[in-house]
């Protein structure tokens, strides 16, 4: 186990180091932001209109053609909001200081352009299965767009491991540990219950997935927002000082913390961007799709980035 931990730590330090994922993903986000002329700003109002115009608990159901705009947003938010948005932010704050929160916000802004580009490609290269359902994603546009099937296969293997094993393990472990510490519930029992509930949703297909998420996500979002507003209201006097620490810590972490935690600007950027990208999944191509004009669905998809962006 110690050897496995050491291996994971080494790989993590390399992947999230100075010359790999952080500059690559931020660079891609900056490129798409400039190339698309700040699409996340120009089309934000239109994305809200298209998405929440279909907000209904008894609206259109998912079928062969996929999901409604709100169902797509709900499914994307359900996948993106989780441990990374709560524990990840706390970890970034601890490891990178208050300034890490500023870089989380920057990662969220750039990520909206990245996920817009992802969704455009997914819309352009999606196909209809023999069963009639529409499917798409990075594996399809890598294979058909780049004409590189080996890379598409490699991506598919990686995304299965990331979403099917690693991501689910982190979320389920956090839930099980929380119930165990708070109520003394056995972790194995919590895991079994989660597996059964998830299986019932998963094997129900796209229609059941969309139906469940469009009902649960508004409740989840409301609890998340109300909880955040309550904390802000009860600590109103700390809001301005907190913002000052965040902005100052983004460029001079030692001055913001008095040198207590001993972080540098490089570490603030590294932990802020890493936790921001982990929380929102930009660059993974995990956004749901439907057969509509690519740019319209993409605006809805980019909105999920903003709605699931970690708060401080």
Model-flagged regions — what are they?
Residues 1-78, 83, 93-100, 111:
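N-terminal alpha-helical transmembrane segments of multi-pass membrane transport
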Residues 24-28, 35-48, 174-179, 186-247:
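Membrane-interface loop-to-helix entry segments
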Residues 118, 309-312:
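Short alpha-helical transmembrane segments in multi-pass integral membrane proteins
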Residues 22-27, 67-74, 148-162, 192-193, ...:
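Select transmembrane alpha-helical segments in multipass membrane proteins
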